Structure formats: C-alpha cells, structure tokens
Amino acid sequence: MNRTVFLAFVFGWYFCSIALSIYNRWMFDPKDGLGIGYPVLVTTFHQATLWLLSGIYIKLRHKPVKNVLRKNNGFNWSFFLKFLLPTAVASAGDIGLSNVSFQYVPLTIYTIIKSSSIAFVLLFGCIFKLEKFHWKLALSVIIMFVGVALMVFKPSDSTSTKNDQALVIFGSFLVLASSCLSGLRWVYTQLMLRNNPIQTNTAAAVEESDGALFTENEDNVDNEPVVNLANNKMLENFGESKPHPIHTIHQLAPIMGITLLLTSLLVEKPFPGIFSSSIFRLDTSNGGVGTETTVLSIVRGIVLLILPGFAVFLLTICEFSILEQTPVLTVSIVGIVKELLTVIFGIIILSERLSGFYNWLGMLIIMADVCYYNYFRYKQDLLQKYHSVSTQDNRNELKGFQDFEQLGSKKIAPYSISVDLTNQEYELDMIAQNVSRSSQQV
C-alpha cells in the first residue's frame, strides 16, 4: 500500500474513532453533555443507519451478494441461529453497554478499561481450549485487572464524592461487561471457524491450475505484483464477491437493531419521553432555561441520531483497508497509539482528568500490559508461521487477516482490541460465503 494512502486511512480511522468516542460521551453525559437518557434507543438508530449505508455500498461497489439466509426457496434457520443471532446479540450487548456506561464514566476511564477485553479473550480462550495455557498469559490477565482496579480507585471522605465514585464504579462494571461480551464474541467466532473450515472454490481452482493471481514482472521497476489475467478471469467466472465486513454489517445490523429496540422498550421505556429530551429541543430564551421543539430542533435531532452511523461506516472501511495490507503488529501499534490519543483528546476537549497517582498508575499498567500482550502474540505468530492473506499479494509477510486455508484449522487468528469487530465481521462473511456454496452443492 502506498504510504500516502496508508496514512490517509490511518487518519480516517483515528478521526472517526476518536470523534465517535467523544461524541458518545457528550451525547450521554448528564452533567456536561446533552444528557440523553436513552442510550440503547439511540444506538438502535445507529444500527438502522449502518444497515442503509451498507446496503447502498454493496449495491454500488460490489457484485450482488447471495443471501445466505435463503436456502432452497426457504429461510436458512441453521445459519441464522448458529452464526448470525449469537454474534448479533453479543455485539448489541457490547455496543449497548458501552454507550450506557458513558452516563457514568469519563471517556478516559472508559477507553482504558475497554482495553481489558484482552483479558477476557485469554480467559475464555483457555476455557474453550482455543488458547494453550501459559503462565505469562495468566499473569497478563491478573495485571490487567489490577490496572482496572487502580483506574477506578479514588479515596475520599466526602459523601458527594463517594456517591460519584459509586456511579463511576457502576459504569466501570458496565464497561467490563461490554468487554466480556466482546471476548465471548471473539471466542465464539473462532470456534465457528474451527468447526467450519473455509475452502473456496476459487482458491481450489487457482491451485489446480498451478497459477497465481499475481505474477512478477522483471520490467516492473517498483516490483509491484502484476495481475495474472488468466487466473483473474477464472475468479471472475465464479461470480463470487470478495469477503468484506460490510456484508456482515448488512446482515447483523437489523438483528442488532431489533435486539436493542426491544431492550430499550423494556428497560428505558423511551416513549414519549425521548421527544421532550434535549436532543429534540432548542434553547429559545437567550441564555435562560426555556426550550421548545421546532422544525429546526427536530432536524438537528435526526442528524445527531444518524451521524454516528456514518462514522462507524467510514471507520469500518478505513480499518478494513488497513487490515488488508498491514502486518498485525503494525495494526496493533497503530491501535495503541489511537487509544492514547483518545485519552489525550478526552482530557483536552472534554476537560476530563485522571485524579490521583493511582489512576495514572492504573492507566500505565494497562497500556503496558496491552503492549506486552501484542508483543507476546507477535512472537507466537512468528513461531506458528501464520500465512498471509491479501487482495494484492498473498505471498507477502503477515497481514491483518489469515489465509483462507488457515481458517478452520487449529490455529486461531491474532486478536487486536483496536480492530476486533472488523476482523470478526470479515471472518463471519467468509463463513457465510462458505455456507452459501455448500448449500448450493447439496
């Protein structure tokens, strides 16, 4: 990937991710933000926007995607119940709890604690025998939770401060629950990949032809891969679309949206209160406390509700473009920098503060543990010799995704908290395409 293009995608990733985090905190913060009391309902609108955008994107940029939920003129309940529903419910819980937590915890604490999902990945990985127990991994989990405890620790004798601290602790548990669901979702995806090996017809055909999709050209000064037209044409004849996380988003978003909407109706009971909240009302008293609902305030409210959906969509495009061509270690390093920048911008823009030595120590411990985890994973990857997968050259060094032939084996994909969801959406789309091919062959 050209360096300028790579930096552009990284900037887009940083901007969308950091802006989205700050936006969500501002939207739900009851003290210094809009204080919207219906975070689960608001998240439902995000999913509706994602579904529409992903549908438009697939229509404009990709070949028609076969509906894996249709099987022999009927509904493919097996794929829906086994793959889509568990992933969608876990994702809805992850995102929903994250947004609810913004009512109680600052962005700085949220960002650092969210990194603890690595600990849940390791824990569940060992329980389900995806991970081989190693004392270094166990120590990493323990250190991670020690860091989380220090992040929320705030000694004080003031009653009001104790009440605030209780809310922060409650919000921190919500973030931990969100991280737990994130870890469970990752482990479940890996179990599905292990039990459903991905073998594409296109890959097999190219292999049988003893040809590569890309060839070397001695006259190519930049030593860039050149498309092997014969085998590329072979791929086109199959008429299959390339796996892409946007395909999965289009399938998951409606299920997540319905799950979140039902949860909101049962727990938040948002109607009719949402219409009198600050998101649909404007201050009309020139500095006073009077507000009213106008056409302008309604338009503003709708824009505020759908804007995060656009941010998540662009975020996914940038993440996937980086993952296609960038080694896992590089992605992890770039992701760690993004987390640090999120904390810094939270301090600058939202005027948040890490109060006291213990909070700073907790943040440093967690970030150091995340760095060590990624280094440990990198060393493991070198030993296990993961194969790369790339849309341009699958003979290059390790990239963010595994080769098709590795999926479903006893090896598992490297986990990165920064691009966790995009990785799993990509993997789930490969499972979907594999299931679709299998059902057509029956």
Swiss-Prot record:
Glycosylation sites: N99
Family indicated by similarity: Belongs to the TPT transporter family. SLC35C subfamily.
Disulfide bonds: none
Coiled coil location: none
Biological process (GO), any one: nucleotide-sugar transmembrane transport
Superkingdom of origin: Eukaryota
Cytoplasmic-facing ranges: 1-3, 54-76, 129-132, 188-254, 323-329, 377-442
UniProt KW keywords: Cytoplasmic vesicle, Glycoprotein, Golgi apparatus, Membrane, Phosphoprotein, Sugar transport, Transmembrane, Transmembrane helix, Transport
Residues spanning the signal sequence: none
Organism: Saccharomyces cerevisiae (strain ATCC 204508 / S288c)
Protein name per the record: Putative nucleotide-sugar transporter YMD8
Subcellular location: Golgi apparatus membrane; Cytoplasmic vesicle, COPI-coated vesicle membrane
Residues that bear Phosphoserine: S209
